[in-house]
């Protein structure tokens, strides 16, 4: 069962705009008994792997979050949402699963739209380990901007998923 925790990231130290506050307030409204945890430079190790450290130094915080969200859900369990995701109904029904993810469209999974899992599921370790083999800054100085939808989708293709946008149970 997925624990009642909502994780989000806010790197860079800037003030949260009203649109972000509106989304976070929707989480509080529809998930009032959930622990909402903000992760940032003070409680997340941005030096945990080269990809994360390089993305952070380049101020490409969305790419830091792509990896960090996997790490905290793997370690603590719970739900992750980007700060532009507004909740419009309670999420309690999703907690009965060991994990869930959402489709961005019929061809791509998008962890930023929200996903949840019990702590310690092997799939998320595999997903994290994929990033351990990469640098964010390529040898020619360009950025490795492979987003989380492609990484998650490519990995899930090896786990019995059908790219049709349907609700499905993925084999263990």
Annotate the PLM regions.
Residues 66-78:
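Small-residue hinge/turn detector
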Residues 1-65, 81-172:
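Glycosyltransferase-associated regions of secretory-pathway enzymes
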